[in-house]
């Protein structure tokens, strides 16, 4: 049965309760990584990023040291052929199964690594097999499947899905054609090139993949962001979900004037989660074509910018909730939904949690799709762009409270000194600004008039692909986020180059006075939220932030927070997180740092920190090997090799 929540009642003032979570029978929920292993990108299929390991704890964490480093085997291919190029930002998080770590690389290779020494055990050579990633950016990792006797690794390598043996890295010949499935197939005639940089997800005997697509295409006609499920043994396509409903399908009416016929995107570019007990996969769906102007696709545009739940075996939609109607802000759902069992007012609930770029924490019953706390439709500003019609309302969770600053006013501007504040006010005056969901605006040709709309949070979040982590024992969620406004300035394109009425032009970022951020700190933060009550427990800046700017000299400033893309790792007693590599975040300026820290989960106090050779690029993970606990994370920068660094006690 498909649960439909297709259109909301409009609420101009007050509160509209969309649903109350139904009691759920107690069941074994998402418990994090088990048995000292790390079998999924997020530790488990529910993306908790949690391990109950406690050999490293608050009493000895200060003794952590580097155990080994592993340089990406992509450099071996480059040594063989100097023309080989790839990104030095290693996105992957390795899996730990049995006596090996398994990782993907930026050339679409895979490798097995000794978990104690960091020695390479085997390599799947994507260049030799003809499946390498053309732009050398790679994916965030692998998926692992076993039925208890057989086991295999699933990897998106360039435009192919491949199945590899865990012992040797050799292709399974019965999977697809000689071990490979061509992912360009079944994507429709509009596809020019397939790419994806997340990690496959296994649910039962199905491996599920999404797709990456341009946020700023030049044509209205685009490929829909199909999500596909393949048989893990044969590679046969089991199902294909189209996020743009076709005639006769629920939601098609939300694409006015036949815009469903040519519109695309609404893809899943990021990581997914699954409840294998229920047999459900949870899709964080992104924005439709294009991200900033929707005059050619009027309507709510289901199932874009929604959390969509599918049956893993059939691809049938079970329930959905749309977080943004008629998206104009690139507020796609950026992170894997998190599955956790909570208790609210005495009621056990099998929950799914979606953190967003807007700084919201949406919490639903993952069985029924009912919100755990009321979600209200509130009026938002209209669009003044010719041909555009913004949604009159957007859904706002009433609880938990936002974990990021939303919208921008004069009161949000930097105020370290009166001079800096005055300069910030002058800068703000050159733009349209207001509450969150203020639509994009057309840039004036007159430099003394508006130069676009300042959007906060921007397209970098709030939250992003690095997501959040949850402790399934305490039901406390830990969310890293950034405060980084952007500018959305629409311009009329050359009609020979684009058939859109408007596309996004320059400027795209806004600097504050003297190159400092425009808004008050913290610019990078961590927020702890009790999911049983929805209460915020603590918030701390992550990192010192800017310290050497000449305008700040002589000021007694607290920690300002380092904006970045660090992913969290939870253990029994500690929260580990870096600052993110500068290469992971193009804006704001001063983004990223090399510090890696352990926080007290109860208080947010920093218990330990280490300066790494480079900033973190992937999500950290932990495991046991030979009786010792290790923590491994990818690091790298533009001028430094991509590598893993492993930490352990002496």
Language model features: what each stretch is:
Residues 169, 223-236, 300-315, 367-368, ...:
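Beta-propeller blade signature
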Residues 341, 515-527, 531-535, 539-544, ...:
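Loop/turn-rich, solvent-exposed surfaces of beta-rich toroidal or solenoidal domains
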């Amino acid at each position: 049965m498909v649960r439909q929540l297709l259109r909301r009642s409009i609420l101009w003032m007050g509160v509209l309760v969309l649903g109350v979570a139904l009691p759920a029978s107690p069941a074994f929920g998402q418990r994090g990584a088990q048995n000292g292993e790390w079998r999924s990108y997020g530790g488990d299929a529910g993306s908790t990023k949690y391990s109950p390991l406690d050999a490293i704890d608050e009493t000895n964490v200060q003794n952590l040291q580097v155990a080994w480093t592993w340089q990406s085997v992509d450099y071996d291919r480059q040594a063989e052929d100097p023309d080989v190029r790839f990104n030095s930002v290693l996105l992957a998080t390795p899996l730990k199964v049995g006596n090996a770590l398994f990782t993907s690389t930026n050339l679409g290779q895979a490798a097995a690594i000794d978990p104690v020494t960091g020695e390479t055990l085997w390599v799947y050579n994507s260049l030799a097999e003809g499946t390498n990633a053309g732009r050398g950016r790679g994916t965030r990792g692998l998926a692992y499947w076993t039925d208890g006797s057989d086991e295999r690794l699933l990897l998106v390598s360039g435009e192919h899905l491949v199945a590899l043996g865990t012992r040797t890295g050799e292709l399974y010949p019965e999977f697809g054609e000689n071990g490979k499935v061509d992912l360009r197939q079944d994507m429709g005639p509009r596809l020019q090139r397939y790419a994806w940089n997340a990690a496959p997800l296994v649910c039962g005997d199905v491996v599920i993949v999404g797709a990456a697509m341009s946020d700023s295409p030049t044509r209205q006609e685009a490929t829909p962001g199909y999500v596909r499920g393949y048989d893990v043994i044969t590679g046969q396509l089991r199902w294909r979900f189209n996020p743009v409903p076709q005639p006769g399908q629920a939601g098609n009416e939300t694409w006015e004037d036949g815009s469903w016929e040519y519109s695309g995107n609404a893809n899943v570019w990021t990581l997914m989660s699954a409840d294998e007990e229920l047999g459900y996969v949870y899709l964080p769906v992104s924005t439709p074509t294009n991200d900033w102007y929707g005059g050619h696709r009027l309507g709510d545009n289901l199932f874009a910018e929604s959390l969509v739940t599918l049956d893993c075996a059939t691809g049938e939609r079970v329930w959905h909730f749309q977080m943004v109607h008629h998206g104009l802000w690139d507020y796609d759902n950026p992170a894997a939904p998190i599955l956790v069992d909570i208790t609210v007012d005495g009621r056990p609930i099998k929950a799914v949690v979606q953190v967003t770029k807007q700084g919201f924490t949406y919490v639903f019953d993952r069985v029924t799709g009912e919100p755990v706390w009321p979600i209200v439709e509130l009026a938002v500003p209209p669009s003044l762009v010719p041909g555009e019609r913004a949604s009159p309302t957007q859904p706002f969770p009433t609880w938990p409270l936002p974990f990021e600053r939303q919208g921008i006013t004069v009161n949000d501007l930097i105020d370290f000194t009166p001079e800096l504040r005055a300069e910030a006010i002058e800068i703000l005056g050159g733009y349209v600004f207001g509450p969150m969901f203020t639509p994009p605006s057309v840039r004036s040709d007159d430099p003394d008039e508006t130069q676009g709309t300042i959007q906060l949070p921007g397209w970098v979040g709030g939250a992003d692909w690095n997501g959040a982590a949850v402790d399934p024992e305490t039901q406390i969620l830990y969310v890293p986020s950034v405060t980084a406004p952007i500018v959305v300035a629409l311009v009329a394109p050359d009609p020979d180059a684009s058939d859109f009425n408007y596309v996004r032009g320059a400027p795209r970022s806004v600097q504050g006075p003297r190159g400092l951020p425009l808004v008050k700190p913290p610019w990078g933060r961590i927020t702890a939220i009790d999911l049983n009550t929805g209460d915020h427990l603590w918030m701390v800046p992550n990192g010192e932030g800017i310290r050497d700017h000449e305008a700040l000299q002589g000021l007694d400033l607290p920690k300002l927070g380092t904006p970045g893309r660090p992913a969290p790792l939870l253990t029994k007693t500690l929260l580990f997180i870096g600052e993110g590599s500068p290469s992971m975040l193009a804006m704001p300026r001063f983004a990223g740092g090399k510090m890696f820290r352990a926080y007290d989960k109860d208080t947010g106090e920093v218990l330990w920190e280490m300066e790494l050779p480079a900033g973190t690029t992937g999500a950290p993970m932990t495991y046991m090997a030979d009786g010792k606990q290790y923590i491994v994370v990818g690091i790298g920068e533009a001028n430094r090799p991509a590598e893993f660094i492993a930490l352990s006690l002496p």
